[in-house]
Amino acid sequence: MKNTLKLIFFILLLFALFVSLRMFIDVAFYSDVIGIKDVSILGIISILFTVSAFLIGCVIFLENRHPSKTLTWLIVLGIFPVFGFFAYLLFGQNFRRKRMFQKKALLDEQAFLQYKGHEDYEERILRNHKHQELLFRLADRLGALNISFQTETRTLTNGDETFRAILNGLKRAKHHIHMEYYIVRDDKLGTEIKDILIQKSKEGVVVRFLYDAVGSFKLSKSYIEELNDAGVEMIPFFPVRFPILNDKINYRNHRKIVVIDGNEGFVGGLNIGDEYLGKNKYFGFWRDTHLYLRGEAVQSLQLIFLQDWFYMTGEAVLAPEYLQAKAVEGDHWGGVQLVAGGPDNKWETIKHLYFAMIASARKSIWIATPYFIPDDDILSALKVAALAGIDVRLLMPSKPDKRTVFYASRSYFPELLDAGVKIYEYEKGFLHSKIVIVDSDLASIGTANMDMRSFHLNFEVNAFLYDTDSIRKLVQDFKDDLEESSEIHGDHFHKRRLHRRIVESTYRLLSPLL
């Protein structure tokens, strides 16, 4: 019944647009013929958008979204019907979302069930992490792949170390290279990677490359054509030709994945571009974190890429050599688990796992993120943890790359500070790491920010680490970052100027749309 009503309102919306357009044409070109005098064209246009905004509001109301999102959209549509109309067409449509991702979700579920291992790892995990039992069981129920204890992980700090490792890995490739990125730049670093991929393709290595069509919209056609001409399969993720008529613009692939010969992998916060090496004048030093994997868990990263590849191309890569990662010998590596999140998931997978991590904390919760727009669940969990005496620290950049998100993020500071959360702003450059560390023996590193876009709209991928050496490196890096940061104190922050508070509150009101 509810879907039928949505469809009726959607048809009425199209009908209103058609009738109003016809009225506009009649008044603009045939007013003398039909005998209409002193008719305001702008008035008719205003009626058009007002009626359309009203119908859109009805659709949003019936979708039963989160109350804050529903209220925000209704306010925007009510006060600014013209702006709200176009904003909804660009960013708000939820009508086709379920149908859009139904096929992908089914394929993902089938593939995960086919390749998910059956190793009985539960006893080993709970022996050393009994208080995190909720997290393990939740990850399993949400469809995360098995934890691997035969995978080497290494934390890569910043662009120089990360891209040196990636470039060397690409040069070692013998069978295949799979890459998936949100942003690819046609600059010095991008050219260096392109040249290696072309050379590897000439050597007979299979190269597949997914790039997000919106994140990489500045990428030149010549860059893509040169790779394709050399035999590299470079495919855009969700290309958008008519943004206003296509709600795919709102669902972006924010993942950063590299898989080499099915046995080495990289995942983390760094895109491909010189700015991520600290060569942008505005940002200066770029602080970011990536993760290197070798061994069993790379199969999970491979599977995530292959599902995205199939969704975009229809090519099912099923050859066994793509999913036979070699386990690294030894029992001292700790555990690693790859988790994919996205609008195609039934559950908000990464958000739920973040929540479980926070809830499992006994001593400390350390978070580094460039964007902080939490929903009520995450916000409450952090405040409750801090009020309970847990050491909760939030590290963010001191300069904005997106002013709307920057100021919306700061609007949450007062209540966090009042609860006892320690907040720091990184001053050496721009902080882009996406890190959560709990009790120094559990961590998440990946592409997901601590914001609603990563939780609800973007395709993301995170690695969850359990008692690995790479966590100890993350802890030390976090401590080093605090040395380059300034702490925000509540008594001082509460005294900020009125106009700054107004800006922050305004952007927070719009945060469900950001």
Swiss-Prot record:
Q: Which residues participate directly in catalysis?
A: H254, K256, D261, H432, K434, D439
Q: Which CDD domains match?
A: PLDc_CLS_1, PLDc_CLS_2
- InterPro entries, per the entry: Cardiolipin_synth_Firmi, Cardiolipin_synthase, CLS_N, PLD-like_dom, PLipase_D/transphosphatidylase
* Protein topology in the membrane: Multi-pass membrane protein
Q: Is tRNA-binding set as a keyword in this record?
A: no
Q: Name one GO molecular function term.
A: cardiolipin synthase activity
Q: What are the GO BP annotations of this UniProt entry?
A: cardiolipin biosynthetic process
The keyword Membrane is annotated on this UniProt entry: yes
| Localization of this protein | Cell membrane
Q: Give the UniProt keywords, A-Z.
A: Cell membrane, Lipid biosynthesis, Lipid metabolism, Membrane, Phospholipid biosynthesis, Phospholipid metabolism, Repeat, Transferase, Transmembrane, Transmembrane helix
- This enzyme's EC code(s): 2.7.8.-
Chief site of localization: membrane
Q: Where is the PLD phosphodiesterase domain?
A: 249-276, 427-454
GO cellular component terms, semicolon-separated: plasma membrane
Q: Which reaction does it catalyse?
A: 2 a 1,2-diacyl-sn-glycero-3-phospho-(1'-sn-glycerol) = a cardiolipin + glycerol
What the protein does comes down to: Catalyzes the reversible phosphatidyl group transfer from one phosphatidylglycerol molecule to another to form cardiolipin (CL) (diphosphatidylglycerol) and glycerol.
Family assignment from sequence similarity: Belongs to the phospholipase D family. Cardiolipin synthase subfamily.
Supply the name of the protein.
Answer: Cardiolipin synthase 2
Q: Look up and give the organism this protein is from.
A: Bacillus cereus (strain ATCC 14579 / DSM 31 / CCUG 7414 / JCM 2152 / NBRC 15305 / NCIMB 9373 / NCTC 2599 / NRRL B-3711)
